[in-house]
Protein backbone atom coordinates (compact mmCIF):
# COMPACT_ATOMS: atom_id res chain seq x y z
CA UNK A 1 0.00 0.00 0.00
CA UNK A 2 2.75 2.42 0.96
CA UNK A 3 4.77 1.66 -2.17
CA UNK A 4 1.70 2.21 -4.35
CA UNK A 5 1.05 5.60 -2.76
CA UNK A 6 4.74 6.45 -3.03
CA UNK A 7 4.75 5.78 -6.76
CA UNK A 8 1.75 8.03 -7.18
CA UNK A 9 3.63 10.77 -5.32
CA UNK A 10 6.67 10.32 -7.54
CA UNK A 11 4.61 10.53 -10.72
CA UNK A 12 2.31 13.45 -9.94
CA UNK A 13 4.65 15.67 -7.95
CA UNK A 14 7.46 14.89 -10.37
CA UNK A 15 5.30 16.36 -13.12
CA UNK A 16 4.77 19.51 -11.04
CA UNK A 17 8.49 19.87 -10.44
CA UNK A 18 9.30 19.35 -14.11
CA UNK A 19 6.77 21.93 -15.32
CA UNK A 20 7.89 24.48 -12.75
CA UNK A 21 11.57 23.92 -13.58
CA UNK A 22 10.97 24.39 -17.29
CA UNK A 23 8.81 27.47 -16.70
CA UNK A 24 11.35 29.18 -14.45
CA UNK A 25 14.25 28.43 -16.78
CA UNK A 26 12.37 29.28 -19.99
CA UNK A 27 12.61 25.66 -21.09
CA UNK A 28 16.36 25.39 -20.58
CA UNK A 29 16.47 23.30 -17.38
CA UNK A 30 17.42 19.64 -17.53
CA UNK A 31 16.94 16.95 -14.94
CA UNK A 32 20.55 16.06 -14.15
CA UNK A 33 19.55 13.13 -11.95
CA UNK A 34 17.42 11.62 -14.72
CA UNK A 35 20.27 12.11 -17.18
CA UNK A 36 22.63 10.36 -14.77
CA UNK A 37 20.19 7.52 -14.22
CA UNK A 38 20.08 6.85 -17.96
CA UNK A 39 23.81 6.04 -17.80
CA UNK A 40 23.17 2.59 -16.40
CA UNK A 41 26.33 1.07 -14.91
CA UNK A 42 27.21 -0.88 -11.79
CA UNK A 43 28.36 2.17 -9.82
CA UNK A 44 25.15 4.06 -10.54
CA UNK A 45 23.21 1.06 -9.28
CA UNK A 46 25.33 0.77 -6.13
CA UNK A 47 25.03 4.45 -5.21
CA UNK A 48 21.47 5.07 -6.41
CA UNK A 49 19.82 1.88 -5.21
CA UNK A 50 21.90 0.80 -2.21
CA UNK A 51 24.23 3.36 -0.65
CA UNK A 52 22.10 6.44 -1.37
CA UNK A 53 18.92 5.18 0.33
CA UNK A 54 20.86 3.80 3.30
CA UNK A 55 22.65 7.09 3.92
CA UNK A 56 19.60 9.29 3.32
CA UNK A 57 17.32 7.25 5.56
CA UNK A 58 19.94 7.19 8.30
CA UNK A 59 20.41 10.96 8.02
CA UNK A 60 16.87 12.25 7.47
CA UNK A 61 14.88 9.67 9.37
CA UNK A 62 17.13 8.13 12.03
CA UNK A 63 19.19 11.18 12.97
CA UNK A 64 16.79 14.02 12.27
CA UNK A 65 13.59 12.47 13.58
CA UNK A 66 15.22 10.86 16.61
CA UNK A 67 16.56 14.25 17.68
CA UNK A 68 13.35 16.23 17.04
CA UNK A 69 10.45 13.87 17.75
CA UNK A 70 10.35 14.98 21.39
CA UNK A 71 9.19 18.40 20.16
CA UNK A 72 6.22 16.93 18.30
CA UNK A 73 5.67 14.07 15.87
CA UNK A 74 4.16 16.17 13.09
CA UNK A 75 6.90 18.77 13.50
CA UNK A 76 9.63 16.13 13.22
CA UNK A 77 8.04 14.45 10.19
CA UNK A 78 7.53 17.71 8.26
CA UNK A 79 11.07 18.82 9.07
CA UNK A 80 12.41 15.49 7.85
CA UNK A 81 10.44 15.77 4.60
CA UNK A 82 11.46 19.37 3.94
CA UNK A 83 15.14 18.71 4.64
CA UNK A 84 15.01 15.61 2.43
CA UNK A 85 13.44 17.54 -0.44
CA UNK A 86 15.84 20.48 -0.18
CA UNK A 87 18.84 18.15 0.09
CA UNK A 88 18.27 16.97 -3.48
CA UNK A 89 18.90 20.55 -4.68
CA UNK A 90 16.87 19.78 -7.80
CA UNK A 91 13.49 21.38 -8.49
CA UNK A 92 12.55 18.44 -10.70
CA UNK A 93 12.71 16.25 -7.58
CA UNK A 94 11.83 18.60 -4.72
CA UNK A 95 8.05 18.12 -4.53
CA UNK A 96 7.97 14.35 -4.71
CA UNK A 97 11.07 14.04 -2.51
CA UNK A 98 9.30 16.18 0.10
CA UNK A 99 6.15 14.03 0.05
CA UNK A 100 8.13 10.81 0.07
CA UNK A 101 10.18 12.18 2.95
CA UNK A 102 6.98 12.86 4.88
CA UNK A 103 5.69 9.36 4.17
CA UNK A 104 8.99 7.70 5.07
CA UNK A 105 9.08 9.86 8.19
CA UNK A 106 5.63 8.70 9.28
CA UNK A 107 6.57 5.06 8.70
CA UNK A 108 9.73 5.48 10.75
CA UNK A 109 7.86 7.39 13.45
CA UNK A 110 5.32 4.59 13.90
CA UNK A 111 7.74 1.65 13.62
CA UNK A 112 11.08 3.07 14.83
CA UNK A 113 12.55 0.64 12.29
CA UNK A 114 14.74 2.10 9.58
CA UNK A 115 14.57 -1.00 7.40
CA UNK A 116 11.01 -0.34 6.19
CA UNK A 117 11.58 3.17 4.82
CA UNK A 118 15.00 2.13 3.49
CA UNK A 119 13.51 -0.82 1.59
CA UNK A 120 10.81 1.39 0.07
CA UNK A 121 13.41 4.01 -0.82
CA UNK A 122 15.50 1.35 -2.57
CA UNK A 123 12.49 0.05 -4.51
CA UNK A 124 11.56 3.52 -5.74
CA UNK A 125 15.16 4.35 -6.72
CA UNK A 126 15.51 0.99 -8.46
CA UNK A 127 12.38 1.64 -10.48
CA UNK A 128 13.35 5.16 -11.49
CA UNK A 129 17.09 4.66 -11.79
CA UNK A 130 17.47 1.14 -13.16
CA UNK A 131 14.25 -0.50 -14.38
CA UNK A 132 12.68 2.45 -16.23
CA UNK A 133 15.94 3.47 -18.00
CA UNK A 134 16.53 -0.15 -19.00
CA UNK A 135 13.04 -0.40 -20.49
CA UNK A 136 13.62 2.81 -22.46
CA UNK A 137 16.78 1.31 -23.97
CA UNK A 138 14.68 -1.52 -25.40
CA UNK A 139 13.21 1.00 -27.86
CA UNK A 140 15.18 3.05 -30.39
CA UNK A 141 13.98 6.49 -29.29
CA UNK A 142 16.55 8.35 -31.39
CA UNK A 143 15.23 6.75 -34.55
CA UNK A 144 11.67 7.44 -33.42
CA UNK A 145 12.19 11.20 -33.82
CA UNK A 146 13.27 10.70 -37.41
CA UNK A 147 10.47 8.33 -38.38
CA UNK A 148 7.91 10.58 -36.69
CA UNK A 149 9.00 13.45 -38.91
CA UNK A 150 8.89 11.14 -41.91
CA UNK A 151 5.37 10.02 -40.98
CA UNK A 152 4.25 13.65 -40.73
CA UNK A 153 5.50 14.09 -44.28
CA UNK A 154 3.45 11.14 -45.47
CA UNK A 155 5.98 8.33 -45.13
CA UNK A 156 3.89 6.00 -42.98
CA UNK A 157 5.94 2.99 -44.05
CA UNK A 158 8.92 4.29 -42.08
CA UNK A 159 6.87 4.35 -38.89
CA UNK A 160 5.50 0.87 -39.55
CA UNK A 161 9.02 -0.44 -40.12
CA UNK A 162 10.25 1.17 -36.90
CA UNK A 163 7.34 -0.33 -34.95
CA UNK A 164 8.10 -3.75 -36.38
CA UNK A 165 11.78 -3.49 -35.47
CA UNK A 166 10.96 -2.37 -31.92
CA UNK A 167 7.96 -4.64 -31.33
CA UNK A 168 9.50 -6.46 -28.35
CA UNK A 169 10.62 -3.25 -26.68
CA UNK A 170 7.23 -1.63 -27.24
CA UNK A 171 5.49 -4.66 -25.72
CA UNK A 172 7.73 -4.50 -22.65
CA UNK A 173 7.10 -0.76 -22.34
CA UNK A 174 3.34 -1.24 -22.66
CA UNK A 175 3.27 -3.87 -19.92
CA UNK A 176 5.43 -1.67 -17.68
CA UNK A 177 3.19 1.38 -18.07
CA UNK A 178 0.03 -0.68 -17.53
CA UNK A 179 1.45 -2.13 -14.32
CA UNK A 180 2.73 1.27 -13.25
CA UNK A 181 -0.67 2.81 -13.83
CA UNK A 182 -2.35 0.01 -11.89
CA UNK A 183 0.00 0.53 -8.94
CA UNK A 184 -0.70 4.28 -8.96
CA UNK A 185 -4.46 3.65 -9.02
CA UNK A 186 -4.27 1.15 -6.17
CA UNK A 187 -2.10 3.56 -4.20
CA UNK A 188 -4.61 6.37 -4.65
CA UNK A 189 -7.52 4.20 -3.50
CA UNK A 190 -5.61 2.96 -0.46
CA UNK A 191 -4.54 6.50 0.39
CA UNK A 192 -8.15 7.71 0.40
CA UNK A 193 -9.29 4.75 2.49
CA UNK A 194 -6.52 4.95 5.09
CA UNK A 195 -5.73 8.66 5.28
CA UNK A 196 -7.82 9.25 8.40
CA UNK A 197 -6.26 6.29 10.16
CA UNK A 198 -2.96 8.11 10.59
CA UNK A 199 -2.03 8.36 14.25
CA UNK A 200 -0.02 11.05 16.02
CA UNK A 201 0.76 11.20 19.72
CA UNK A 202 1.61 14.11 21.97
CA UNK A 203 5.36 14.35 22.59
CA UNK A 204 6.80 15.02 26.07
CA UNK A 205 8.22 18.40 25.00
CA UNK A 206 5.60 19.26 22.36
CA UNK A 207 6.16 22.77 21.05
CA UNK A 208 3.17 25.15 21.37
CA UNK A 209 1.42 25.75 18.07
CA UNK A 210 2.37 29.44 17.91
CA UNK A 211 6.12 28.94 18.21
CA UNK A 212 6.71 25.73 16.23
CA UNK A 213 7.63 27.28 12.89
CA UNK A 214 9.91 29.94 14.38
CA UNK A 215 11.66 27.45 16.66
CA UNK A 216 12.19 24.75 14.04
CA UNK A 217 12.82 26.79 10.90
CA UNK A 218 13.99 30.13 12.30
CA UNK A 219 17.22 29.01 13.94
CA UNK A 220 20.59 29.85 12.39
CA UNK A 221 21.41 26.32 11.29
CA UNK A 222 18.11 25.69 9.53
CA UNK A 223 18.04 29.13 7.90
CA UNK A 224 21.56 28.55 6.58
CA UNK A 225 20.63 25.12 5.24
CA UNK A 226 17.50 26.42 3.52
CA UNK A 227 19.27 29.42 1.96
CA UNK A 228 22.19 27.35 0.66
CA UNK A 229 20.07 24.54 -0.78
CA UNK A 230 17.58 26.95 -2.40
CA UNK A 231 20.46 28.95 -3.88
CA UNK A 232 22.15 25.84 -5.28
CA UNK A 233 18.80 24.62 -6.63
CA UNK A 234 18.26 27.94 -8.42
CA UNK A 235 21.78 27.87 -9.87
CA UNK A 236 21.23 24.31 -11.05
CA UNK A 237 18.24 25.37 -13.16
CA UNK A 238 20.53 27.24 -15.52
CA UNK A 239 23.56 24.94 -15.65
Predicted regions and their residues:
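Single conserved hydrophobic/aromatic residue that forms the stacking wall/gate
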Residues: 1-11
Amino acid sequence: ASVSWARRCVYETGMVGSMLSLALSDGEATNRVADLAMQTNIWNVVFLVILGPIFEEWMFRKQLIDHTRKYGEKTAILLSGLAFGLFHMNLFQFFYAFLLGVMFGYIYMRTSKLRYSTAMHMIINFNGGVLAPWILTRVDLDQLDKVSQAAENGNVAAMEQWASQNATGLAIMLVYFLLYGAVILVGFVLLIRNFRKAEFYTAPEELPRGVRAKTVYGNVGMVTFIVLTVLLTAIGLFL
